[in-house]
Amino acid sequence: NKKKNNNTKSTVYFDDLIDKKEKFHKYTFVKSNKSSFILFTSGSTGYPKGIIHSTGGYLLYSKYTCIKQFGLDKNKTILTASDAGWINGHTYSLYGPLSIGATTILIEKPISLISEKFLKNILFDLKVNILYLPVTLIRLIKSVSSKKRIKSIYLETLGSMGEPLSKYIGQWFTKTFSEKKIQIVNTYYQTETAGIICSPKFNDNISKVPYGSVGKP
């Protein structure tokens, strides 16, 4: 468990919500191909379609991409500012991090991160190592933030999602939040794919993928 800091208001710790006397809870074994959940597409291509994700395959892919794309492990903390209605909200806010044993931060309203004070409190008080934001939110943060840099010594990886990342916004994102210039994990995914299918990796120092590109499949 991470050391708590009372400076971050409206923060609820999972350990405070569960019965600490019960270290293990009952669970049921299921087959790997058993349906886990149904998530509907946005409907941008017509009538929304319900996508069924299986238990074993989905969990394995969630864990794999968290490790490979972001470098997540059980000693790190990830903040994925995605609504639960998006597949990324399922995969990179919940199932992926928890399957690894990492710490994940759930934001009830991701738009609240446009408050510079709130964002800094989250990043510094909760020692966020991986910050994964929608490009729309990155632009909004830039539009309302001061010109001061919010550099955190804890941040190791930055990620973007949702729409193309321009070079201008990408450079601002890196310059503002990281101590050193790091590769942005600019991601492409679909509801149907369960998670990321194209992106640079967190430690990609070879291909030099340009901003706005998600690389090759």
How would you name each of these model-derived features?
Residues 99-102, 129-132, 142-211:
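Gly/Ser/Thr-rich phosphate-binding loop
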Residues 56, 136-139, 163-164:
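Alpha-helix/helix-capping structural signal
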Residues 27-30, 188, 210-217:
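Short Gly/Pro-enriched turn/cap motifs at secondary-structure boundaries
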Residues 10-11, 17-40, 47, 71-77:
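Conserved pre-ATP/AMP-binding loop-to-beta segment of ANL
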Residues 59-77, 87-129, 143-145:
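Conserved AMP-binding/adenylation subdomain of ANL enzymes
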Residues 1-16, 134:
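Structural core segment of the AMP-binding/adenylate-forming
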Residues 38, 51-54, 81, 87, ...:
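Generic beta-strand/beta-sheet core signal
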Residues 35, 41-44, 66, 78, ...:
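Conserved S/T- and glycine-rich ATP-binding loop of Class I adenylate-forming
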